[in-house]
Amino acid sequence: MASLKHYLNSVIGEAMAEATQSESCNANVITSSKPGFGDYQANGIMSEAKRHGMKPRDLAEQVIISLKQSLPSLIDRLEIGGPGFINIYLSDKEIKQRATRAIQEPTLLIPSAEVPIKVAVDYSSPNLAKEMHVGHLRGTIIGDAIVRVLERRGHTVIRQNHVGDWGTQFGMLITYMEEAVGANNDLPNALSDLESFYRDAKKRFDDDPAFAEKARLSVVKLQNGDKDYLSAWEIFIDESLRHCETVYEALDVTLTRNDLDAESRYNNDLSVIIEDLQGMDLLAESKGAKCVFLPEFSGKDGEPLPLIVQKSDGGYLYSTTDLAAIRLRQKMKVQRALYVVDARQSLHFQQVFAVARAAGFSDQDLSLEHISYGTMMGKDGRPFRTRSGDTVKLAELL
C-alpha cells in the first residue's frame, strides 16, 4: 500500500486532471503547517489553474465536488483555503483502523522498494580490546534501525560489524596476559572485567620501557602467525565478543558473529592497497609516511591535507583498512555502503571515499555514504576515554 501522501497525491491529482481535461496534474500534497489547515494540503491547485487558464478557487471547487461524489473513506472532509489551496482532513476512524492493520499486518502499509538493491551497513564496530561503553549506544541503535528499515522495504542488507581486533594494543594485552595470568585457560576469569584489564596493561606499557619493548615484539610475533600468540589472541577475542553479545542481546539488536567484518580480515590486503596506490602514482611521501594528496582537501592554512595510508614505521591505519573494505564491497556488487559513525569522522570518510574513487577501488555504481551522528560526551564535555576509568560501561547501564 502506498504512503498517505502518495495516495492523496494520486486521488486529488486524478480529480484535477478530470476538471482540467488533461492527462495528468500534480496535486503537490504536503503536510499542513498548522492544524487549522487540516492534516494535509494540496498546493498544486495554484500552478495547475494558471497552466489551464482557470481561477484557482474555481478549480478547487470542481475538484472537491468531483471527490465528494465518491469520497475515499480515508478523507473526512475537504475545504478550500486562501486563494485556492485544498485543506485535507483525514478520518480519525480510518487512521485508527490503518494503525491497527499496521500492527497486525505491517507489510500491507509499508511500501516495498520499487528497485531492491544490495546494501552494506557498517555499524556498532567496537574495539575488542575494551568493553563497550555508553558511547557505542548511538551507533549500534541507529545502525540496527537502518538495517531493519531497509530489510522491511525489501532490500538485501549485509550487516558489517567492523570490530577492532588487530594492532599494537593486542601485543600489549597478550604480553600482560602472559605475565599477569599465565596459562591461557585462566583467561576467561581474568577478562571478566575487560576495562580494568586494559587500563592495567596500558599503565604497565606507559611506565615500563622493558614491558613496552616486549609488547612490540609480541605484535611482530602475532603478525607473523606465531601459534602461541595467535592462540592467546583468539581466546581474548572470543571472550571480548561474549561481552559484546551480552550488550546486543540486552539491546535486542540483530548483529551476530556471522556479521563480523573484523580488521584482521584485511591483513593480507593492506600491502596490496599500498602497491596499487603506488602503481597509480597516487602516493607521496611525507616525513617518511606514505600519503595520498587530493586537490579537494586542504587545511586551514591552505596546505594540502593528506590521507595517510602507511606510517613511517611501516604500520597501516584505519584508512588503509577502510580502502580494502570498500574494494571488497565493490567485488560483492554492493550498491550502497553506509557507514554509521559519529560526526568526528566526517573528514576521514570524505577523504577515504575520494581516494577510493580516484584509485578505482569503487565505481559510480557503489554509493558510499557516511551516516553521522553526534558524539556522546563525558561530564567534562569531552569524548569518553577508556584509560581515564570514568567511562560508563554499556552492559552496566543496560
Region roles according to the model:
Residues 1-29:
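Charged, compositionally biased N-terminal leader segments and the immediate start
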Residues 17, 23-42, 47, 52-398:
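NTP-dependent nucleotidyl-transfer catalytic core
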